[in-house]
Amino acid sequence: MKKICYVATIPGTIESFFIPQLRYLSENGYSVTVVCAYSDSLQIQLGGKVIFHSIDIPRGISFAGSVKAIQELTAFFKLEQFDLIQYSTPNAAFYASIAAKAVGCKVRNYHLMGLRYLGASGMGRAILKTIEKIACAKSTSIECVSKSNMELGIREGLFPREKVTVVWNGSTGGVDLAKFDYARRDQWRGEIRGELGYSDKDFVYGFVGRITRDKGINELLEAYFRLNSDAKLLLVGEIEDEQTLNQELFEKAKKDSNIVIHNAVSDIERYYAAIDVLILPSYREGFGNVVIEAGAVGTPAIVSHIPGPIDTIDPGVTALTVPAKGAKALADAMGGIRQEDYVNMGRSAARFAKEKFDSRVL
């Protein structure tokens, strides 16, 4: 039996993107092991067939933590003798690629979900880019989640073209059309709008993801307030690095009765259905799974014109694009999309998600 190991820094990465694939492999003749920080929730979700081994992989830059993580991974890989080791997220990729190469694992795949250094500057950017280069060099193959980020990585000198691939049309695992079921849109829309106090006639802009600067939250709030309209704004996700947010705008948002800031949810498909237009104004993204998930249930989007999100849409048909970090352009697009046939754009988004990102095909 072939032995496969998946490595990530935090349990959330596995929970959000990889559980269906891990279960599929474990049920079809492979021994599958997951390595990341410990989580009771992840242990339960993986079930009995996927092995879970806990190793704390530090986030950020920590010399002592780095040495310890590499030593622990090396010892574990040497003991288990995996046939394939795959890793995602920058720190996990850096440590695991070094350890996997050290023990002679023949297949070392970097599942590259985005380039963190693009959001940094100065010495920090240089260090993070070097970490990416080392992880790529130590890997036997690199799997990018979007074609646009693959091309960016080649231009940036991270890897040669012959070493990298994108599976089908990209994404971390496609979209589960049984979960993100367009046929249930009207039902879910009514349920969630009722819970949130929205009427069916209310126009609702939505954001799903980490509520932090690099996701474009400052620009989204500024754009929303520029509109000065009766539209609602629903933000679904955990607040992260609140100090990076524009405090004046964020405090104003928390006091605005037309804005709801909601914790992350497990049934996000129902919230996508309650939204009229999804907004993803990120500064950087590996792909932008939220766009194809929302699209699958019939919700069009406005996204930053950057590598990653541009692979998730058919411009002008399923979504609009705007420059990153441009609040005025975003406000114009948010106002403009209400004048277009956004309902038909949503139908097109559902067809696009089904044709391009069905997880069963991927």
Feature names for model-found ranges:
Residues V291, P300-V303, I313:
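Short hydrophobic beta-strand element within catalytic cores of glycosyltransferases
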Residues D314-G316, L320-A327, G335-E340:
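Conserved acidic donor-binding segment of nucleotide-sugar-dependent glycosyltransferases
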Residues Y87-A93:
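Short His-centered aromatic/hydrophobic patch
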Residues E15-P20, F203, F207-R226, K328:
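A conserved mid-protein helix/loop that constitutes part of the nucleotide-sugar donor-binding site
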Residues A264, Y283:
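Aromatic "clamp/platform" in nucleotide-sugar-dependent glycosyltransferases that forms part
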Residues Y38-S41, K138-K179:
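A short, active-site helix/loop in glycosyltransferases that binds the activated sugar's phosphate group
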